[in-house]
Amino acid sequence: MDIPNRVFAHRGLNTLAPENTMAAFRKVVEHGLNWIETDVDILGDGTVIICHDTTLDRTTNKSGGYYGLTAADLETIDAGSWFGSEFAGEKLPTLHQLVDFMNETGLNANIEIKSNEAGAAMTRQLIKAVIKELGRLDGPEVLVSCFNHVLLSEFHALAPDIPLGCLYETCSLHDDWRSVLELVGASYIHPEDAGLTREKVRAFRDAGFGVNVWTVNSPARANELFNWGATGIFTDVAHLIPCC
């Protein structure tokens, strides 16, 4: 599997602008970078939004969950002031807005689908809505990942041409990883950096999978991982890490 090394800006350039906002994604383009990693979930009206958490408390001026909200509610949510006054009024983006931005700029994206907590029906609605939005891409590359491998398997059944990455925490990366990836239909494994060894990276690569590691903020560690055969790293400081 011949894959160019990739540096994914984790939630955009989140040290320079509020995470998972258009401001953070614009910073990526301004720095000449090619890939972002971002997170998607769904509102009550079916709108797919960019947000890491299942509540609004940490990164906005609101609190509580958003599964009962609609697109109209997004106008009242400030996702920037917590980071800095210059970002006051920054909104939670929608996936629709991000796809438009990708088409305009050529930016590529790893879309992490959050493991929706509202049940199977809403999860399937999220999967279908993401597939519909990604179908509007005209040129940029996309990779879809998730910690919920059952969700990824359902996604693959509906969109077999979109490459998938199985996310793993170190504590959940068991010896059956190859069976899981093959059953899901994944092309990539996304392991946590903590405890990752050269031997494990080589095993992943020898089995035919790309290896994108999270979250790596040390340029020296990134270089080591690439030398081991990793195909990508997710980082909060993508502007400080060379791609190869």
Q: Over which residues does each language-model region extend?
A:
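Phosphate-group recognition and catalysis centered on beta-loop-alpha active-site segments
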Residues: 1-244
